[in-house]
Amino acid sequence: MYHKSDEHILDNYTFGIFDMYFGNHKICVLDIETTGLSPERSHFILGGLLSFEGNNKARFTQYFAESLSEEKEILERYLEEVGSHDVVVTYNGRNFDIPFLLTRAKKMEINVDNHPYNLDLYLVLNGHSSLRKLLPNLKQKTVESFMGLWAFRTDKISGAESVTLYHEYLLKKEKNEDTSAHRDLLLLHNQDDVLQLSKLFPVLEKTDFHKAMYTLGFPVISGNKKLFVQNITFEKKYIKVSGVQTSLPVDFVSYGTGNDDCKIFFSKKSQTFEFFCPIFQKNDFVILDLLKLPVDLQNVFDEFPNFESGYLVFMSHNDIKYREVNFFIKNFLLKVLEDIL
């Protein structure tokens, strides 16, 4: 196994909406290299990880398999480091990188108890921005060019070429020939993908980020207690929120005796949670009465234009107020984690 770690100086990204969901969380950026697209038949050969350490500093780490027999070793080390973070940023990672890693881990009987929330920039851009209409495609390099980042790339190969390059590397190694040039090209390609992705955060300002988080879900973290919100739905008399417990799962049930009470369910066995909070309709508005909650959240919404006298508007003329809905869910669950569980 070849392991590399070095420090980089990067500008800290700050954006109010981003910080609402991910402020004070331990964030990393990852990209992986494999011998193919199928995790059933292909191998994980290289993982790059950029971990933000504060004060404009970040640590970039790579794990490289010098032979296919080292796959399990680098996968264990890589997943352990990824799992020490709260949020992992990827580009199409929900469709490729993360499922690939988890499938390979399962095949190799590697236990993955703790995994971070995956913020997939591709899914945010594809579903919640106008860039899809403006650009020929949403490949990472295309978006980099649009954001004026292309000049920062130094690698000259594509993902497909990296597969060929790795096979050439293995052949040279079998013949006891010098493999350093091939290895360094692979490492450079992976490094550029990760570092360039870390510079793409400002593209989020061109998205409807609140809507993206409503659709894709978001983390709620208090100390070592972590929840990932996955589904938000409006029913006739309730807003229903469900997701997973990703660390220290617990069993907990809370519900009142009336029809207008909140209901909260946490399952240790399934590592899931869900809660229902009563809502009501007034003309064309869907409203939550904060006074009927088991936790006090009134002061949280003082600056929100859709909050008045203890009432929070969730929907107006079928227009969902994504910021209000998400902010309520996050703060409600934080109160549950901190004051009840």
Which positions does each model-derived feature cover?
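Short beta-strand scaffold segments in enzyme catalytic cores
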Residues: G47-L49
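DEDD superfamily 3′-5′ metal-dependent exonuclease/proofreading module
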Residues: M1-S42, F52-L341
